[in-house]
Curated annotation (Swiss-Prot):
The keyword Heme applies. The chain crosses the membrane at residues 34-54, 78-99, 114-134, 179-199, 227-247, 289-309, 321-341, 348-368. Keywords: Electron transport, Heme, Iron, Membrane, Metal-binding, Mitochondrion, Mitochondrion inner membrane, Respiratory chain, Transmembrane, Transmembrane helix, Transport, Ubiquinone. Heme 1 (or BL or b562) is low-potential and absorbs at about 562 nm, and heme 2 (or BH or b566) is high-potential and absorbs at about 566 nm. PANTHER family: CYTOCHROME B. The keyword Transferase does not apply. InterPro entries: Cyt_b/b6_C (IPR005798), Cyt_b/b6_C_sf (IPR036150), Cyt_b/b6_N (IPR005797), Cytb/b6-like_sf (IPR027387), Cytochrome_b (IPR030689), Cytochrome_b_C_euk/bac (IPR048260), Cytochrome_b_N_euk/bac (IPR048259), Di-haem_cyt_TM (IPR016174). The cytochrome bc1 complex contains 11 subunits: 3 respiratory subunits (MT-CYB, CYC1 and UQCRFS1), 2 core proteins (UQCRC1 and UQCRC2) and 6 low-molecular weight proteins (UQCRH/QCR6, UQCRB/QCR7, UQCRQ/QCR8, UQCR10/QCR9, UQCR11/QCR10 and a cleavage product of UQCRFS1). This cytochrome bc1 complex then forms a dimer. It comes from the Eukaryota. Its cofactor is heme b. This is Cytochrome b. Component of the ubiquinol-cytochrome c reductase complex (complex III or cytochrome b-c1 complex) that is part of the mitochondrial respiratory chain. The b-c1 complex mediates electron transfer from ubiquinol to cytochrome c. Contributes to the generation of a proton gradient across the mitochondrial membrane that is then used for ATP synthesis. It is a multi-pass membrane protein. It comes from Amazilia tzacatl (Rufous-tailed hummingbird).
Length: 380
């Protein structure tokens, strides 16, 4: 009998072991679709980004015009740009849902997989930030100025660090050039990290909604989950195309239709919607260094998830109190997102401060306490 090429060829063997003959728990739900959706997002973003880079000029005098030229004169340039801009939003929707799933079902107990995932999130955030600066509109320029300026809060080396990042004494041509270089490079770094993420995942196999070992009931990834993923792809591509074609500027800021002007500050400087929760936490502390530390902590706190797990059960499936707390946390994040988009005035200031405090309290104090209480209740 001839050898099966899929199982013997050095390259195809790797593909086979991770996409075809991969033993998968039979009971994983649609919440497990987001990993492959993130892969699809990454491929879409790299493809559209590459096509956009072919028509982009990384120069302060030409960047804004080159983007306008792409939209007006390049075949389907408007569509490529709209897919790329809104694709970023879908990327973040998917990654936030993916993290939420991991948090709910205790997937963070696969420490290496979880930690590489958090590093992936940080890299994605950096990529989105530098990418937002490239069209060189008002919000691009002022967003870059405000966020890079945060590094000056670092004692002793802060100011030097900021000027080194800027390549001068303000956000200018060198900044734009290096941001373009970084925006081109980072997605490939994300692709590399994704392979590491998957390597660690395939060491242990997937978690499942029950949080118990599924070794006794595994099914091949193909055709079962390849088909299920394909449905997921369709369900994500449909709204993405709808948004890109019918309402491409819905999630953008109108300020970015004005070319960057260092002499005019926009009335409300705010990032894209997917950074608003962190921006609200940053603003809720009336001290520069304190705000920066809280901003960093709001994302880096994910690294602590495995250490804050005190429950005897892995998932929240059979833990009603933790479930309640989880959904309060989700609501709290939505409130933070909303507050981040509002001006800095009463009552938004106090709402933001309460929501920020609640965010850290739930994660650091209430989750471990609730888990301990649930453990106690199991003994009765």
């Amino acid at each position: 009998m001839a050898p099966n090429l899929r199982k013997s060829h050095p390259l195809l063997k790797m593909v086979n072991d991770s996409l075809i003959d991969l033993p998968t728990p039979s009971n994983i739900s649609t919440w497990w679709n987001f990993g492959s959706l993130l892969g699809l997002c990454l491929m879409t973003q790299i493809l559209t980004g590459l096509l956009l880079a072919m028509h982009y000029t990384a120069d302060t005098t030409l960047a804004f015009s080159s983007v306008a030229h792409t939209c007006r004169n390049v075949q389907y340039g408007w569509l490529i740009r709209n897919l790329h801009a809104n694709g970023a939003s879908f990327f973040f929707i998917c990654i936030y849902l993916h993290i939420g799933r991991g948090f709910y079902y205790g997937s963070y107990l696969y420490k290496e997989t979880w930690n590489t995932g958090v590093i992936l999130l940080l890299t994605l955030m950096a990529t989105a930030f530098v990418g937002y600066v490239l069209p060189w509109g008002q919000m691009s320029f002022w967003g870059a100025t405000v966020i890079t300026n945060l590094f000056s809060a670092i004692p002793y080396i802060g100011q030097t660090l900021v000027e080194w990042a800027w390549g001068g004494f303000s956000v200018d041509n060198p900044t734009l050039t290096r941001f373009f270089a970084l925006h081109f490079l980072l997605p490939f770094m994300i692709a590399g990290l994704t392979l590491i993420h998957l390597t660690f995942l395939h060491e242990t196999g997937s978690n499942n909604p029950l949080g118990v070992s599924s070794n006794c009931d595994k099914i091949p990834f193909h055709p079962y989950f390849s088909t299920k993923d394909l449905l997921g792809f369709l369900l994500m591509i449909a709204p993405l195309l709808t948004l890109a074609m019918f309402s491409p500027n819905l999630l953008g800021d109108p300020e970015n239709f004005t070319p960057a002007n260092p002499l005019v500050t926009p009335p409300h400087i705010k990032p894209e919607w997917y950074f608003l929760f962190a921006y609200a936490i940053l603003r809720s502390i009336p001290n520069k260094l304190g705000g920066v530390l809280a901003l960093a902590a709001s994302v880096l706190i994910l690294f602590l998830a495995p250490f804050l797990h005190k429950s005897k059960q892995r998932t929240m499936t059979f833990r009603p109190l933790s479930q309640l707390l989880f959904w309060i946390l989700v609501a709290n994040l939505l409130i933070l997102t909303w507050v981040g988009s509002q001006p800095v005035e009463h009552p938004f200031i106090i709402i933001g401060q309460i929501a920020s405090l609640t965010y850290f309290t739930i994660l650091l104090i209430l989750f471990p306490l609730t888990s301990a209480l649930e453990n106690k209740m199991l003994n009765y």
